[in-house]
Amino acid sequence: MEGHVKRPMNAFMVWSRGERHKLAQQNPSMQNTEISKQLGCRWKSLTEAEKRPFFQEAQRLKTLHREKYPNYKYQPHRRAKVSQRSGILQPRVASTKLYNLLQWDRNPHAITYRQDWSRAAHLYSKNQQSFYLQPVDIPTGHPQQQQQQFHNHHQQKQQFHDHHQQKQQFHDHHQQQQQFHDHQQQQQQFHDHQQQKQQFHDHQQQQQQFHDHHHQQQQQQFHDHHHHQQQQQQFHDHHQQKQQFHDHHQQQQQQQFHDHPQQQQQFHDHPQQKQQFHDHHHHQQQKQQFHDHHQQKQQFHDHHQQQQQFHDHQQQQQQQQFHDQQLTYLLTADITGEHTPYQEHLSKALWLAVS
């Protein structure tokens, strides 16, 4: 039809466009009805991940169609007007073909192409224009001829009634297919909306992750910079301390040199003073070693005392446990009334230990 703008294909049409051709090549004798049924079942068995590329392609085609036809509005094909002349009659062959077209799968998950419906409508219109009923004359002549004419007229009326019913079924089925197609488009729009929401949510998460990562990097850089500044400050302070110590040492040396020139002269003139200084230093080292040795001995003595105390404490605990066990044994014997010489001896020993 010239000037008619086709609706954009949905996801199922995009997928079945190639699958229908493959299935028809693999099974040349398969009817279009059976092909449509199998395509519908296969599409229903696909997962969301497998359907996603076809939904995306359908969305792309829909966007291109909207850009190409911005003022497009869906207008279903108008049903061809049926002539009210009593002479129109569809032949049995055409009626059978149209009936086969009308018996397409009514499963809501199976979709047939609008081209098939266009062919059916064209066939129906062509048959209407090609066949006519003969006008019925008033019965005259022989009674058998009148009865035959009446019978033919009754058959023509029955055929016209059947044709009208087929027409109504075709119209109802076309409306059902259109409603299902609209439902598919609504599902497609809902799926696209869900995808857009998911993409927006993912974009928000990516922005949040980028913001968190950037914030962490800034914090790490600030921490590193602060640590570097602290190290520089410590190095500077240490350098200042070294410089102060060096200056103080030089001042002390200069002061000592200035205050005791005679001592320096005597130290230089008398090597014995050097020997005395060396002996004094050696004596100080020996004293320090003796002090350290004494501390080690004291620590060893303290450790020995601690071990002795621990050993005495363990012995006391063992004796106390043994005493408690013997006392329990005696109490049990008193309760049960059993007495042995060993129990009497043990009782006397415990009495002496307690007293």
Swiss-Prot record:
DNA-binding region: 5-73
GO CC annotation: cytoplasm; nuclear speck
Cellular compartments annotated: Nucleus speckle; Cytoplasm; Nucleus
Chief subcellular location: nucleus
Gene3D superfamilies membership: High mobility group box domain
Keywords: Acetylation, Activator, Calmodulin-binding, Cytoplasm, Differentiation, DNA-binding, Nucleus, Repeat, Sexual differentiation, Transcription, Transcription regulation
Gene Ontology molecular-function annotations: calmodulin binding; DNA-binding transcription activator activity, RNA polymerase II-specific; RNA polymerase II cis-regulatory region sequence-specific DNA binding
Domain of life of the native organism: Eukaryota
Record region (Disordered): 135-322
Bias (Basic and acidic residues) ranges: 159-204, 235-250, 257-278, 289-314
PTM: Acetylation of Lys-81 contributes to its nuclear localization and enhances its interaction with KPNB1. Deacetylated by HDAC3.
GO biological process, one term: positive regulation of gene expression
SMART domains: HMG
PANTHER family, per database record: SEX-DETERMINING REGION Y PROTEIN, SOX TRANSCRIPTION FACTOR
Function: Transcriptional regulator that controls a genetic switch in male development. It is necessary and sufficient for initiating male sex determination by directing the development of supporting cell precursors (pre-Sertoli cells) as Sertoli rather than granulosa cells. Involved in different aspects of gene regulation including promoter activation or repression. Binds to the DNA consensus sequence 5'-[AT]AACAA[AT]-3'. SRY HMG box recognizes DNA by partial intercalation in the minor groove and promotes DNA bending. Also involved in pre-mRNA splicing.
Domain notes: The Gln- and His-rich domain may mediate protein-protein interactions.
Quaternary organization: Interacts with CALM, EP300, HDAC3, KPNB1, ZNF208 isoform KRAB-O, PARP1, SLC9A3R2 and WT1. The interaction with EP300 modulates its DNA-binding activity. The interaction with KPNB1 is sensitive to dissociation by Ran in the GTP-bound form. Interaction with PARP1 impaired its DNA-binding activity.
Membership in a protein family: Belongs to the SRY family.
Protein name per its UniProtKB record: Sex-determining region Y protein
UniProt organism field: Mus spretus
The gene coding this protein: Sry
